[in-house]
C-alpha cells in the first residue's frame, strides 16, 4: 500500500473550502484514496462528509493511502496540494 504523511497546509484546516478543494482533487485523480489523522481510522477521501468529519486542523499530520494502480502519482499530487494549501490539484509534482 502506498502512503504519504503530510501536514495540513491550510491555516483553517480541512474545513469548508479547503475540504471541498481536497475532495474534488481526490475524485479527479481517479484513484481510490483514504485519508486519516495520524492516529485515526481512514475514511474515503472522495467523501465530503467523511473529510469534514475528520476535523483535521491546520498543521496537523494526516495520512493519505491507496493500494490501487496509479496510487504513487496520485498520492504525491494530493500530498503537495494539502501540504502547500493549494487551490487546485497540481498537474505533476
Swiss-Prot record:
Catalytic-site annotation from UniProt: 15 (pros-phosphohistidine intermediate)
SUPFAM superfamilies cross-referenced by the UniProt entry: HPr-like (SSF55594)
Keyword Cytoplasm carried by entry: yes
Primary localization class, coarse: cytoplasm
InterPro entries referenced in this protein's UniProt entry, alphabetically: HPr, HPr-like, HPr-like_sf, PTS_HPr_His_P_site
Pfam families: PTS-HPr (PF00381)
Keyword field contains Cytoplasm: yes
Subcellular location: Cytoplasm
Domain of life: Bacteria
GO biological process: phosphoenolpyruvate-dependent sugar phosphotransferase system
Positions of the HPr domain: 2-89
Keywords associated with the record: Cytoplasm, Phosphotransferase system, Sugar transport, Transport
GO cellular component, one term: cytoplasm
UniProt xrefs under PROSITE patterns: PTS_HPR_DOM, PTS_HPR_HIS
Matching PANTHER family: PHOSPHOCARRIER PROTEIN HPR, PHOSPHOCARRIER PROTEIN NPR
Role played: General (non sugar-specific) component of the phosphoenolpyruvate-dependent sugar phosphotransferase system (sugar PTS). This major carbohydrate active-transport system catalyzes the phosphorylation of incoming sugar substrates concomitantly with their translocation across the cell membrane. The phosphoryl group from phosphoenolpyruvate (PEP) is transferred to the phosphoryl carrier protein HPr by enzyme I. Phospho-HPr then transfers it to the PTS EIIA domain.
Protein family according to the UniProt entry: Belongs to the HPr family.
Protein name: Phosphocarrier protein HPr
Gene: ptsH
